[in-house]
Every structure is written in structure tokens, then in C-alpha cells.
């Protein structure tokens, strides 16, 4: 798998038809994975709820409940990893489309969506080390795990989640790429 920091180095050339298939494949992968992410979020919320119940009742199972939160968070971040990897693959295909004759139209698209692409790829870089992300997230909550139920997670100095805004942006990017398919 490509490192996000040096992702464009030594990319082999690909014909445009294949690049559009790659975009389509990873777009579908990300979209179809969204319900899996929502389920993982719900499991995390339930684990946090159970942890809060342990705290309120001063139950001795607090450490066990915290471990269940950690496991649910790990699962969620693994699901995020798949989703943002799909963004990475779309970015790589878009970059290659920019290098084709008449590819300037794709360069403009890449520029238009660059902030969103880079935000997702920054998270992709972080979640390559899922355990470190989980530890950083647990540390960021400063012991108040109820913050995790807010669906906003800390990745290297930025808050991020996979939500309908992210999915909407992905839909816009996909449509924009496919609308320009006849350009190359």
C-alpha cells in the first residue's frame, strides 16, 4: 500500500479507461462501507454507555468496560482506514488522469477538491498505525470517554469523522470525475 506522503512517486502509467474503473471501484467501496462505519459508531456509543453506567454505579468492572471502549474504537478506526484508503486510491487515479493529454480538466478538479482530499489522506496516514491512533484518542479524552460518543475523533491535531458531509463530498468528487470522462 502506498504511503500517503510519497504517494505519487513511480506510479506506472495507466490508460484512462482503467483509471475510471479504479475511481468507480473505490468510490463504490467507500460508499458501500459507510453503513459498516455507522454500525461501528453505534457499537462504540454502546460501549461508552456501558462504561458510563460502570462509573455511575461505581462498578468494579470499569477497567473491563474501558477495554471494551478501546476495542470498539479500534474497530471503528479500522473501518475508517478502509474508507480513507478508498479516497487515497481515487486521488492516485485522479493524479494519473492529470498527466494524460487534455488532463488539465482533471488537474482543476483535483485542485477544487484538494482540501477535502488532503484532510482524508492526513487521517489515512494516521490510521496506518491504528493502535497509536486509539491510544492518542484515549489520551485526548483525558479519562472522559463519554466524549467518544460525540462522533468527533482526534487525529494528529485535527478533529475528523466519516459522516454524511464526507460522503456527500465523495459523491461530488465522483460525479465531477465521471462527468469529465470524455475529456481524455
State the predicted function of each range.
Residues 114-138:
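Histidine-centered, metal-coordinating catalytic motifs and their short helical/loop contexts
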Residues 1-116, 146-184:
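Amphipathic alpha-helical interface segments
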Residues 135-147:
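Short linear, low-complexity motifs centered on an aromatic residue
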Amino acid at each position: 500500500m502506498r504511503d500517503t506522503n510519497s504517494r505519487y512517486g513511480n506510479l506506472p502509467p495507466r490508460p484512462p479507461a482503467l483509471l475510471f474503473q479504479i475511481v468507480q471501484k473505490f468510490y463504490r467501496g467507500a460508499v458501500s462501507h459507510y453503513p459498516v462505519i455507522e454500525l461501528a459508531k453505534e457499537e462504540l456509543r454502546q460501549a461508552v454507555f456501558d462504561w458510563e453506567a460502570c462509573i455511575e454505579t461505581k462498578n468494579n468492572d470499569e477497567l473491563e468496560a474501558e477495554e471494551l471502549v478501546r476495542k470498539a474504537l479500534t474497530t471503528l478506526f479500522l473501518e475508517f482506514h478502509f474508507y480513507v484508503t478508498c479516497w487515497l486510491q481515487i486521488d492516485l487515479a485522479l493524479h494519473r488522469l492529470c498527466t494524460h493529454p487534455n488532463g488539465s480538466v482533471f488537474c482543476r478538479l483535483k485542485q477544487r477538491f484538494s482540501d477535502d482530499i488532503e484532510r482524508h489522506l492526513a487521517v489515512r496516514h494516521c490510521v496506518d498505525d491504528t493502535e497509536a491512533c486509539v491510544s492518542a484518542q484515549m489520551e485526548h479524552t483525558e479519562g472522559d470517554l463519554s466524549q467518544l460518543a460525540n462522533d468527533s475523533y482526534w487525529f494528529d491535531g485535527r478533529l475528523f469523522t466519516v459522516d454524511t458531509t464526507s460522503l456527500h463530498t465523495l459523491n461530488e468528487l465522483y460525479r465531477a470525475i465521471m462527468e469529465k470522462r470524455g475529456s481524455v
